[in-house]
């Protein structure tokens, strides 16, 4: 199948449909890496026509295109409007799989990494969505077809992610509900900025 690691982590695939194939060629490649690789090739291939096509693909919103287009011909169903920005989800996924960080630490790291791009409410909203989907969609990953591991982490049930299909996200979501909104890097925001407590 063509699904990537980001889609598999979020369960953004139809069970026994597009998630099932003889071989999952992109199963350990996060969506943002796919985008960077396509952009790199478009910039370096030396073929203008191919480069233009690849750049057009990158400019097209991610969509399963299951709904008819809008009257003006634009895509009606945009994945990131429904599940959130893949750059955030890939960030969360990396720190969960590679380092096993807790939700609060990932939230604080994301606030630092995406400062100016996303506000703290947006980061928290999509982190909650990520945890809900990551746990609730494990049943889809438990029966994935074979595929290569090309990075430092993957969601394969035969290697990196040995998680039961009925695992519950409650503890992780409870931690996110109790976060101190003024906390950055584990200390109050005024202290982190050089101020006093």
Locations of regions flagged by a protein language model:
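ATP/NTP-dependent adenylation/nucleotidyl-transfer catalytic domains that generate, transfer
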Residues: 1-197
């Amino acid at each position: 199948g063509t699904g990537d690691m980001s889609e598999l982590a979020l369960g953004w695939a139809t069970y026994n449909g597009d998630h099932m194939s003889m071989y999952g060629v992109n199963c350990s490649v996060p969506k943002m890496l796919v985008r960077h690789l396509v952009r790199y090739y478009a910039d370096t291939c030396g073929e203008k026509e191919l480069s233009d096509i690849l750049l057009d693909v990158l400019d097209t919103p991610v969509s399963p295109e299951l709904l008819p287009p809008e009257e003006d011909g634009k895509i009606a169903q945009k994945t990131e409007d429904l599940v959130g920005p893949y750059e955030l989800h890939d960030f969360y996924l990396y720190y969960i799989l590679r380092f096993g960080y807790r939700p609060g630490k990932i939230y604080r790291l994301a606030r630092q990494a995406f400062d100016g791009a996303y506000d703290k409410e947006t980061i928290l909203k999509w982190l909650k969505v990520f945890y809900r989907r990551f746990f609730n969609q494990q049943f889809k990953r438990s029966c994935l077809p074979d595929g290569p591991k090309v990075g430092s982490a993957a969601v394969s049930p035969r290697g990196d992610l040995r998680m039961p299909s009925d695992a519950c996200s409650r503890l992780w979501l409870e931690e996110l509900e109790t976060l101190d909104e003024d906390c950055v890097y584990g200390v109050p925001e005024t202290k982190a900025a050089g101020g006093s407590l």
